C-alpha cells in the first residue's frame, strides 16, 4: 500500500471507483485466544474438539486447537477495526451494511495463540439504478502471522445506503 493511501478518506463514488484493483486497508495483528474460540463455540453450538479441547487437539495434525472457519469469517470486522488505509465515508450515506459473500475459502487453519490480520482490496463498485445504495466488493484476506498461505479469502459485499 502506498503511503499516500494511509489515512485517506473517500467521500465520493467517483473517487471510490478509482480504488478498484487497489489494496485499501491492512489491519493490525490480532491475537486469537482459546476464550474467544470457546465463546464462539458456545454461541453456535459447534463444540468440535479441534476447537475446544486443547489436549485432544494436540493429537491431531493441527497440533492444537484452531479457530472455527466461521469465527474467522465473522470476526473480519473485529480484526480490521484498527486498520490503516482508506476509509469510505460517502457523502449523504446514512448507513453501511454487510450485503453478502462470494467465493469464501478457508485455506489454512488459524491456530489458537497465533495472531491474524485482515487485508482488503477493492475489486468492484456497483451503484443502484435508483441511486439508493452503492455496493462495494472487496477481496478480504485473513493472514496468520508467520504463515505463507492465508487462512481465508472471501469476496465480501457491503452497501452504503442513502
List the model feature ranges, each with a label:
Residues 1-19, 108-162:
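HotDog/MaoC-like acyl-thioester-processing domains
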Residues 2-98:
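Hot-dog-fold acyl-thioester-processing enzymes
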Residues 101-106:
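Short alpha-helix capping/helix-loop boundary micro-motifs
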Amino acid at each position: 500500500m502506498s503511503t499516500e493511501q494511509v489515512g485517506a478518506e473517500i467521500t465520493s463514488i467517483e473517487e471510490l471507483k478509482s480504488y478498484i484493483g487497489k489494496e485499501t486497508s491492512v489491519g493490525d495483528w490480532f491475537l486469537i485466544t482459546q476464550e474467544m474460540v470457546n465463546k464462539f463455540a458456545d454461541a453456535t453450538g459447534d463444540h468440535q474438539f479441534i476447537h475446544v479441547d486443547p489436549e485432544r487437539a494436540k493429537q491431531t495434525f493441527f497440533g492444537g486447537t484452531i479457530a472455527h472457519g466461521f469465527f474467522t469469517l465473522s470476526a473480519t470486522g473485529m480484526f480490521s477495526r484498527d486498520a490503516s488505509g482508506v476509509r469510505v465515508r460517502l457523502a449523504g450515506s446514512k448507513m453501511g451494511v454487510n450485503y453478502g459473500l462470494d467465493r469464501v475459502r478457508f485455506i489454512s487453519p488459524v491456530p489458537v495463540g497465533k495472531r491474524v490480520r485482515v487485508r482488503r482490496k477493492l475489486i468492484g463498485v456497483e451503484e443502484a439504478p435508483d441511486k439508493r445504495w452503492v455496493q462495494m466488493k472487496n477481496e478480504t484476506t485473513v493472514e496468520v502471522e508467520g504463515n505463507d498461505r492465508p487462512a481465508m479469502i472471501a469476496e465480501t459485499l457491503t452497501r452504503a445506503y442513502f
